[in-house]
Each structure stands twice: as C-alpha cells, then as structure tokens.
Amino acid sequence: MNELEQIISIMEQFQKEQQQMKNDINNLYNTVKNSLIMQKNSTTDMNERVLPALKLMIDGLGNNLKYEIADYITHNNHLFFPKIESHKTTINNIINEGKSLARFGDGEFSIIYGTNRWSFQQYDEQLSERLLQVLQSDNDKLMIAIADNYGDLSKYTSESKSEIRAYMTDETRKKHETLLNKNKTYHDAYITRWYMMMNDKKTEAPANRLSNLKKIWNNKNVIAVEGEFTRLGVGNNLFDNAASFKRIIAPGTNSFRKYDDILDACLKYGSKNDLFLLAIGPSSGVLAYDLVQNDYQAIDVGHIDLEYMWYLAGAENRTSIPGSIPKFV
C-alpha cells in the first residue's frame, strides 16, 4: 500500500469513527430525553441522579475522544497505548503453548492503588502487593491481560463505550501508565467478556468467539476454583466438552483471607495435567501466578458463564441469571 492509499484508508476509518461518535451522541440525547420525561415531576431526582449521570457521560466522551482518534492515526507518541494482543492470539497461546492467564480490570487496579471498587473483596494490603507483583512479573508461561480500553472503542456497544470513557479519565490513564510497561506486550482481558460488551451480537462473531473459548478446556480435566455462589457451568452446557469437571469451593466474599488454604487445596488435589479455571475475584490473578510457579496451567475466567447465559438468551442488556450471583464483572 503506497502513502496515498494509506492516507485514504486512515480517512475512511476516521469517517467511520465519526459516524459512530454521532451515533453515541444521539444515544446520549435519547437517554437524556427519556430521563427528562420520566423525571419531569421530580426536581430532586433530576438534580441528584440525571444531571450528574449526564455530566459523567459527556465528560467521558470528551476526555476519551483524543485517544480514540489517535488510535486510528498512528498511536500518537504523546499518548499512552499499551500493546495488547488480540482475543484470538490470547486464546491460541493458551491452547497451543499451554500458557496461563491473569486478568487485570478496574477492580484489580483499584486494589493496587489502595482503593476498592467491589463489595465482594475488601481492600487488603497484602493482596495489593501481590497483584502489583503479578502485574509486573515477567514469566513467559503467564500472560498478563488488561482491558482493551485505551484507544479505539468501535467494537463495543454504545453503553460499553460510555462506561469505558467514564472510567478512563486522564487521572486513571496516568496511573496505568506508571504501572504498565510500554515495551511489554499484554493480552486481552476481555476474552471472558466476549458477548455483552460487543456490538456484533447479530453476526456470527459471538458464536466464533465461543467456539474458540471452548477449545481451551476441550478434553481437559478441569478444576474450577470458584466462590461458593459462583456455580460455573451450573444450568448450562458450557463445559460439557471437558473430560472431567471438579470444583474447589472458596468463600464467596473476601476470598483472599483464605488464600493460603485455597492454594494448598489446589496443590493437594490438582495434577500437572489438570487445567485450573479460576473465578475468585482479584485473588484469581495471584492464584494463577502461584500455580504457574508450581508448573500448573491456570486461567482466570471470571464469570465467563454469565456471558454464555446472556448469549443463549439473546440478551441485549445485562440481566440477572437465576442461580448465579447478580454481579456484572
């Protein structure tokens, strides 16, 4: 592709992004309009709920715009863009190279900062130190995954883009930049958020992503390490292609308080051929790290089956699933 063709390609991509921005603004307008209709008789609700939410959405769109545009143009050297491998590459590394995965999202970062975004895991200084250790570790068998929030957001739904923009403030970006290595290649934390966030629900893409995900545990002896109410695979057939499926049950909240017991149980009941699927909140990343140190393969999957249940239901919005904890993590 010559230079002129590259310029035309960039302009076409930018034009598409402009249209998506217009769609987002239109959705924002409709949200505000509907809120005004619903709240027209309540000045208190308008002042306390609607206007702050509106300001958050507008600020998020404005603050994030330069990153989304710059991502199309050359990864502007003045802006921070961590290198993140694709969903497909991340899964291929798990399947073909036997690599493990520790995921870092807003909750893990907040604990590292010394704050808390979750009700099911209180801040713990030792957990904060361990998460930072894992985030900055350099073990070829453990992939460190972060959320693909830093630049182009065109693959996400309008609601997801608004949430990302509200979170990715300049302050948040500066904190991430101090913690992340610009020379390191990270992986896609959203491999377990493969349905609800994405704007391609009406295509074959979700089914393809699901098919790739299921290859991770195909014919594997799986040990799920989960909170007592998580119930991975209960009420669905997500893990039916596993050779076997056993569980180690951890506390449903503040699992790190029992971390040593959880790790001991994994080492006692697991074998080197087992695949550990971890769903114990921010402790999952630490456990993945420690299991890799002991030559096990472990994947932090979060509430992966909640996405599967939404997919089966053809859900367009997040809804509670009977029998599962109603947390959207």
Where are these regions (language model features)?
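Electropositive, gly/pro-rich neighborhoods at or near active sites that engage anionic ligands
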Residues: 30-32, 37-238
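A short, acidic, amphipathic alpha-helical segment used as a generic capping/interface helix at domain edges
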Residues: 85-87, 125-135, 257-269, 273, ...
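Residues at the C-termini of beta-strands that transition into short coil/loop
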Residues: 148, 249-251, 302
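Structural motif
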Residues: 221, 274-275
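Residues at the starts of beta-strands that form the adenosine-phosphate
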Residues: 221, 244, 297
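A mid-sequence, solvent-exposed acidic-amphipathic segment
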Residues: 227-273
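C-terminal functional extensions of proteins
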Residues: 279, 283-329
